[in-house]
Amino acid sequence: YVQERSAVYVEALKRGTSFYLVDRVIPMLPRELSNGICSLNEGCDRLALSCIMTINKKGEVIDHKIAETVIKTNRRMTYTNVKKILADKDAAVIEEYKELVPMFEKMAELAAILRKKRMKRGSIDFDFPETKVVLDEDGHPIDIKPYDRNVATKLIEDFMLIANETVAEDYFWQEIPFVYRTHDKPDSEKIAKLSTFINNFGYTLHIGADEVHPKELQKLLMKVDGTDEESLISRLTLRSMKQARYTTACTGHFGLAANYYCHFTSPIRRYPDLQIHRIIKENIRGRMNDNRREHYESI
């Protein structure tokens, strides 16, 4: 729906992303697309680009296929209701969605396996509390409440991460021009300063050859979890790291301890995802010739 060089394409490129304000959303794409024909609305057939994966009990992707598909959403679910099913064991909600409960339970089982595998390799999870602002009828802020990051939101995060990793690795080995989401190793000087600071609280970092493994930072965050100094040390750890970037070279993602990573899952609200979808579709349709490769390399 967003053709290259069209007016919608040009405007999406200018915006780059959707903006989520306190009381409204300014979408990257026109609302007719973002809330309509591109949105997985209940009971509607929608064109999609899917990463279909076979994952074993160890959390390893043993087979996958990236394909143009048609998705029809049978039921519209909310994070709240999925949480009530999986965590709260709410009898009324379980009864309402009883035909879907076994699938949610399998999804939760798989998400836990994927999360455990990421943590084992050293992926860092900054679980900062998010907030939402409550407004009165006149649009004035009257309260700030914590945003609940629960089993349902984490489940979706786990699935998005594995899809992004799988797509990035696939296109890296195909040697097709691509946009990766990369996160470089932190500067040794900043890590040294962090190490010196946390020593005051009795914590240490093992730094080898002037660099630190993400697993060391993960261990630190686990040690400070629930302590009085957790907020301070967690934020200083985050500031010690570099910002993630979009690059055409696949140099890995330090924070996720991943060799391959991209942003594939949100083409409605992020321009890099939209560009990736365009590249993938051209490749699937057999149109990725030398001219198109040169075109993508040039931009």
Predicted regions and their residues:
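Conserved, carboxylate-rich catalytic/transport cores that coordinate ions
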Residues: 1-299
